[in-house]
Regions:
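Secondary-structure end/capping motifs
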Residues: 203-281
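A generic alpha-helix surface/boundary motif
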Residues: 26, 66, 121, 195, ...
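Short, glycine-/small- and polar/acidic-enriched structural segments
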Residues: 2-144, 150-156, 160-166, 177-189
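Short, solvent-exposed mixed-charge patches
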Residues: 1, 203, 299-301
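Pocket-lining segment of extracytoplasmic ligand-binding domains
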Residues: 67, 146-238
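Alpha-helical scaffold segments in soluble metabolic enzymes
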Residues: 22-25, 53, 122-125, 153, ...
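Conserved C-terminal helix/tail region of periplasmic/extracytoplasmic solute-binding proteins
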Residues: 273-301
Length: 301
């Protein structure tokens, strides 16, 4: 057992409470400390950039959209998925104020941050489940920017719908933007966020990986049983909005997080990313993930 805490960096794509809560709980309530780890969360916007930092050694692990992870691995990025984290697609499609239903989007424009991102996937797949086909029924517009920019684009009429996270949705609902549908419910059980590390880390520090996953798993169990205690700790930091919002986020996500990962989850990601042919060439689903560390971490509770 290491006596001095080892410092490791975790990249996260989002500064939101829902995006970082599993790491915050594991750090603040001593679960990383019990593994002699000191974890710093580094905000890196965009999955591809976060994974480039991982490959370059700037960070040790990254929380990233599952579809972005399998796409990078299919392009020979030297990394693997080591765990699930959030098997729930945290997106709701919100409309401009003159849009009242999904069918009102026919002939309209849906705005997303950029090509190949999870927001684009969420919007296109979610609308497909509702019977609307991209390019036939509506257009996708890239480069609409972050949440405030997308809300502004809805207001100005540049776009007529856009996907927003739970936290963003709470804010925009107050401003009168209509909810068209919850994408997470339309695409259930999808490995939305996963944990990825480099092949170098897998080869050189297997014990650390087991410790990281065990700490996160214990933190998630603690969160489920101690929502109010976690909420109080987060509220004291005064970083994530008003107490009511913090509690709403914790109640929404406490039961959702799970480190669980199965072959079928990775197959769903490969199918969603439409890279079945590339996956086959690379040697199949096993190329994309490893369960050896998760198995050890969850055995040693």
């Amino acid at each position: 057992m290491r006596t001095e805490a080892k410092s490791i960096n975790f990249a996260s794509n989002t500064p939101t409470l829902s995006g970082t809560l599993p790491l915050t709980v594991a750090q603040d309530f001593g679960f990383f400390g019990a593994e002699s780890l000191e974890v710093k969360t580094v905000l890196i916007r965009g999955g591809p950039t976060a994974m480039a930092a991982l490959v370059g050694g700037g960070v040790d692990y990254t929380l990233v959209a599952g579809v972005a992870a399998v796409r990078a691995i299919a392009q020979n990025a030297p990394m693997q998925i080591i765990s699930g984290l959030q098997p729930y697609m945290d997106y709701t499609l919100l409309g401009a104020k003159n849009i009242h239903s999904v069918n009102d989007l026919k002939g309209k424009v849906v705005g997303v941050t950029g090509p190949g991102g999870i927001a684009e996937f969420a919007a296109v797949e979610g609308l497909a489940k509702k019977g609307l086909v991209r390019d036939r029924d509506y257009k996708i517009l890239y480069g609409v920017g972050n949440s405030p920019s997308r809300a502004q684009a809805l207001e100005s009429g540049k776009i007529q719908a856009s996907p927003f996270s739970f936290l963003e949705r709470l804010e925009l609902e107050k401003k009168g933007f209509p909810i068209l549908f919850d994408i997470g419910s339309a695409i259930p059980g999808f490995p939305f966020v996963v944990i990825v590390t480099s092949k170098q880390k897998i080869e050189n520090d297997p014990e650390e990986i087991v410790g990281v996953l065990r700490a996160i798993q214990r933190g998630l169990e603690f969160l489920k049983r101690n929502r109010e205690k976690v909420a109080d700790g987060i509220i004291k930091k005064n970083k994530f909005g008003d107490p009511a919002t913090v509690r709403q986020v914790i109640n929404q996500f406490a039961e959702v997080y799970s480190v669980s990962l199965q072959k079928s989850d990775v197959e769903a990601l490969i199918g969603a990313t439409r890279i079945e042919a590339e996956a086959k060439k690379l040697g199949g689903t096993e190329k994309f993930y490893t369960l050896q560390f998760l198995t050890k971490a969850t055995e040693q509770k």
